[in-house]
Amino acid sequence: MRARQLGITLGLGTPGPFNAITDVPGVRVGHSTLNQRIDGRQVRTGVTLVQPRAGAARLQPCFAGCHVLNGNGDATGLEWIREAGLLTTPIAITNTHSVGAVRDALIAEERAELGDSGLYWCMPVVMETFDGLLNDIWGQHVGARQVGEALACAESGPVREGSVGGGTGMICHEFKGGIGSASRRLPAEQGGWTVGALIQANHGQRRELRVDGYPVGRRLGDIPSPFSEEGTPGMGSIVVILATDAPLLPHQCQRLAQRASIGVARTGGGTEDSSGDVFLAFATGNQDLPPADYARKDLPQSTPLRMLNNDHISPLFAAAAEAVEEAIVNVLLAGEDMRTEDGRLVPALKGERLLAALRETGWPGR
């Protein structure tokens, strides 16, 4: 179930055909999911991977930028993006304690895949949120096998949402969270560009939850919360990946990443000290950036670029905010009930219950 299937149309923009990050040409998404008992412990975790282009990211770099709304989180590879403005690897999302293992596995995959003697370093982007309530996070069950599976199955088309990949054990606004996606396509007179969002949602308090601007969370307090006896509501994080085919430069990608904060705020998130809210945006509009291989001596001294004029960038900002907002609602509607190891229920938010809560707040529908 997704927001639009319930008649919840967020914002003014129009989604792409998949209403997902994969509406940006060349972008692919893959998941590897662990949902089983291992050595007597419940394991619910995995890896979600975004390939920014149809070819190898190192050979076809993208301009990129990042933004941190609240820094109680971790991510590898972002310092070089801040410095050089280039995304040269796939982007992986996993749980907090598996960042290093996923990074190492991506490095090994890169070396084996390219096999170029000129390739001498790789700094993959790996992002995380904490799934320790529903997953044996200390067991560090994610490794090279899961990374390989996510790479192998990365594809365009509809994106699987909810309890899948890195989002398998996540909690959002005290409901079952996980992976979500949405997109917006600008009209031709605004460039026809697409902005897509993919999120891993593990954040937010229920009482703060808003959908289409209406405070539905206050109408959902009778549904059990996994934090009623232990833990702090809102503890957790949200990771956002934004993709666009607009010809943005790195500083413009950073500006786009900042607008993810608006989508998070519209749904009632973004105010928790314990949340790691890390956002990355990349742009595929410049197709011929030189390969990111500093051992080569035959690269040109300069490369012609295209840039979207800032006078025309505001519709992209609006599209990014709307896509993130809708992706969060899609996460909530894609959930399934789960229980913690000690028996606490992490409930899914059912579509009919969300609609009832919306109507109670005076939501008119559209």
Predicted region positions:
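Alpha/propeptide regions of enzymes that mature by internal proteolysis
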Residues: 1-366
